[in-house]
UniProtKB/Swiss-Prot annotation:
It comes from Albidiferax ferrireducens (strain ATCC BAA-621 / DSM 15236 / T118) (Rhodoferax ferrireducens). Its EC number is 2.1.1.45. Gene3D superfamilies: Thymidylate synthase/dCMP hydroxymethylase domain. It comes from the Bacteria. The lineage of its organism: Bacteria, Pseudomonadati, Pseudomonadota, Betaproteobacteria, Burkholderiales. This is Thymidylate synthase.
């Protein structure tokens, strides 16, 4: 049983879009109920924001984030570990083109070089934590047409609140801008993934965690998810669990799946739904 307060930011969001959204056609041909612009704030000191009104596949969230941090663009590494969440978009050889991990770790420069945005962000957090330029972008306009799927969670920024007591630690917050948000299937993954990343970066930079702020553009519920959403909204949320990171590796790129444990995850049963490809 978690000692954290019960929060329902995600469920309130899902209910808001289901109630106030407009019908909109979309690229997949499925149809959506959509609103434009929404924000949720999660205090990471109130628990790890893993949705509780349905069981969320935590293993896939952790593996996908580690895969991004590898700078990888081939699903083979994920498949070898039993994770198939990217298979629908992969080419026959498993490649996805220059997607998230490639842009995070090796954004191409005009002179033929590459920028490791994650390494640069960590370096700046350690040397100039008051910077307003600690940003990582996956939205590389010049390479969008080479990607199997254009970035949905496109851009994120870190912010350090100074220590409030002598000898205390600063607090690391992260804000994500997600241009396209599949609220039922995708957003629970995205919230947990960036909350996990914030914890990892905070550990590497000797900071405490602050808030994770999720900001969405086109926020939608697919028409073929309506029954699942109604079921989920009929359930009462539990308190969020606690994230434990068992060791501090030498760098942000050296974490392994076994380093993470979520304690006290009380949740309702999983709800299956089709993915719009």
């Amino acid at each position: 049983m978690s000692s954290h307060p019960i929060r329902s930011q995600y469920e309130d969001f899902l209910r808001h879009v289901s109630t106030h959204g407009v019908f909109k056609a979309d690229r997949t041909g499925t149809g959506t109920t959509s609103v434009f612009g929404y924000q949720m704030r999660f205090d990471l000191n109130e628990g790890f924001p893993l949705v509780t009104t349905k069981k969320v596949f935590l293993k896939a969230i952790v593996l996908e984030l580690l895969w991004f941090l590898r700078g990888d663009s081939n699903v083979k590494w994920l498949q070898e570990r039993g994770c198939t969440i990217w298979d629908e978009w992969a080419r026959p050889d498993g490649d996805l083109g220059p997607v998230y991990g490639v842009q995070w770790r090796s954004w191409p420069t005009p002179d033929g070089g590459h920028i490791d945005q994650i390494a640069e962000a960590i370096k700046t957090l350690k040397t100039n934590p008051d910077s307003r330029r600690i940003i990582v972008s996956a939205w590389n306009v010049a390479e969008l047409d080479k990607m199997a799927l254009m970035p949905c969670h496109a851009f994120f920024q870190f912010y350090v609140a100074p220590a409030q007591t002598p000898g205390g630690k600063g607090k690391l917050s992260c804000q994500l801008y997600q241009r396209s948000a599949d609220i039922f299937l995708g957003v629970p993954f995205n919230i947990a993934s960036y909350a996990l990343l914030t914890h990892m970066v905070a550990q590497q930079c000797d900071l405490d965690v602050g808030d994770f702020i999720w900001t969405g553009g086109d926020c939608h519920v697919y028409s073929n998810h309506a029954e699942q959403v109604a079921l989920q909204l009929s359930r009462t949320p539990f308190a969020y669990p606690t994230l434990s990171i068992k060791r501090k590796p030498a760098s942000i790129f050296d974490y392994a799946y076994e380093d993470f444990e979520v304690l006290g995850y009380e949740c309702h049963p999983a709800i299956k739904a089709p993915v719009a490809v």
